[in-house]
């Protein structure tokens, strides 16, 4: 039995080592303080947890299965690949775990107007869904480029009664949508609650989103012990902002000496070309209220990120991932657009599961590693979402 890792972060100021924190304008200081205070109360309130657990079970469909992909494993000829099926959550991805938690907080705080940012549209759909469920006004900011790539999700949000506001600034993707949402929050601090979709932004968001997503890892730990009789050798998740990955990794951090934790970023067209691999190629900087590793030019200007998957197309990454990389508890690598497409194709043809392009980045790494490992080894992949939203891109790229 290897020694357990003792891990505790963030500190009371929201720092994960040198990362994280609250780099915010004065207009948001009270909002941030109120949010943190209310969250810490909710965190210790059994009634809050009971309400959330009930919704996760009866509305979202948790626990999601841990599925042994035996044909995919056989194809690779090595380790056994298991899939944590977050694609089976209501709305098609892990994002709803967090949206539900935050909307319950908004209700506790008496907020009536909800805003959110979205890249792939999955967080937008999840937020629109929970706002419809609770009868709250909802505005989602989305980059024009992402609106083009993710038309079905835009239609879903509108059908759910949400106003989708196109963002035409900058790269017209997730970074710009986030900036616009923060601007809205600064202009309407009293009545508005901002539901952040990933483990990014100022404290307490990275901690809060992690806590709401950690249900993924809690379930997986129990399921793999029940089904395989032991902990896995490797756990893999894709990393954009990083919420599905931190949700999976957090419960396994004490076991990091015996379980290898791997985060897979988007290498896009290649690490020397256009990509979104902030942990691999980024430098330390501040974006959206938090210190993190960022893609930036020689003058410190934030660069545009590129990935075939809209959900990984962010030039930064959650501060906790930066800290875990620095501590050596998680190892980060990257997968190109082409490799992700090939993995998506292979999973569809061997297991009958069409996953999201984001998740396909993790699947590719798992397939590659499985081929190099003995048959009795276990790799768990967080299959963070389903591929319905990506069919336009998939049809185009795979010439279907």
From Swiss-Prot:
Pathway the protein takes part in:
Amino-acid biosynthesis; L-tryptophan biosynthesis; L-tryptophan from chorismate: step 5/5
Family according to the record: Belongs to the TrpB family.
Which source organism?
Answer: Chlorobaculum tepidum (strain ATCC 49652 / DSM 12025 / NBRC 103806 / TLS) (Chlorobium tepidum)
Quote a single Gene Ontology cellular component term: cytoplasm
Please identify the protein, giving its name as recorded.
Answer: Tryptophan synthase beta chain
* Superkingdom of this protein's organism: Bacteria
Q: Cross-referenced InterPro entries, in alphabetical order?
A: Trp_synth_b_CS, Trp_synth_beta, Trp_synth_beta/beta-like, TrpB-like_PALP, TrpB-like_PALP_sf
Protein encoded by which gene:
trpB-1
Report quaternary structure and partners: Tetramer of two alpha and two beta chains.
């Amino acid at each position: 039995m290897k020694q357990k890792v003792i891990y505790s972060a963030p500190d009371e100021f929201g720092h994960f080592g040198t990362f994280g924190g609250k780099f915010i304008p004065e207009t948001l200081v009270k909002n941030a303080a109120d949010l943190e205070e209310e969250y810490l109360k909710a965190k210790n309130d059994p009634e809050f947890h009971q309400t959330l657990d009930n919704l996760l079970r009866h509305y979202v469909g948790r626990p999601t299965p841990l599925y042994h992909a035996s044909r995919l494993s056989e194809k690779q000829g090595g380790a056994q690949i298991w899939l944590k099926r977050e694609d089976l959550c209501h709305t098609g991805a892990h994002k709803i775990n967090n949206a539900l938690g935050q909307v319950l907080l908004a209700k506790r705080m008496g907020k009536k107007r909800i805003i959110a940012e979205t890249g792939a549209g999955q967080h937008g759909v999840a937020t629109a869904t929970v706002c419809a469920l609770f009868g709250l006004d909802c505005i989602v900011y989305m980059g024009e480029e992402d609106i083009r790539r993710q038309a079905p999700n835009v239609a879903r949000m509108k059908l759910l009664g949400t106003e989708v506001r196109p963002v035409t600034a900058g790269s017209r993707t997730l970074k710009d949508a986030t900036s616009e949402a923060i601007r809205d929050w600064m202009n309407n601090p009293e009545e508005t609650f901002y539901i952040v979709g990933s483990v990014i932004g100022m404290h307490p968001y990275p901690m809060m989103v992690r806590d709401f997503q950690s249900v993924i890892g809690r379930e997986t730990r129990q399921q793999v012990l029940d089904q395989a009789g032991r902990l896995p050798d490797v756990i893999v998740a894709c990393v954009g902002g990083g919420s599905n990955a931190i949700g999976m990794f957090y419960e396994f951090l004490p076991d990091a000496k015996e379980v290898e934790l791997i985060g897979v970023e988007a290498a896009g067209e290649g690490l020397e070309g256009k990509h979104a691999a902030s942990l691999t190629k980024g430098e330390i900087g501040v974006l959206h209220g938090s210190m993190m590793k960022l893609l930036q030019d020689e003058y410190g200007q934030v660069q545009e990120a590129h990935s075939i998957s809209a959900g990984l197309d962010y030039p930064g990454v959650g501060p906790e991932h930066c800290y875990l990389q620095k501590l050596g508890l998680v190892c980060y690598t990257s997968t190109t657009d082409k490799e992700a497409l090939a993995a998506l194709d292979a999973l569809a043809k061997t297991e009958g599961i069409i996953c999201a392009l984001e998740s396909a980045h993790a699947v590719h790494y798992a397939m590659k590693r499985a081929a190099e490992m003995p048959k009795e080894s276990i790799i768990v992949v967080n299959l963070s979402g389903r591929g319905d939203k990506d069919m336009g891109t998939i049809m185009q790229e795979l010439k279907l």
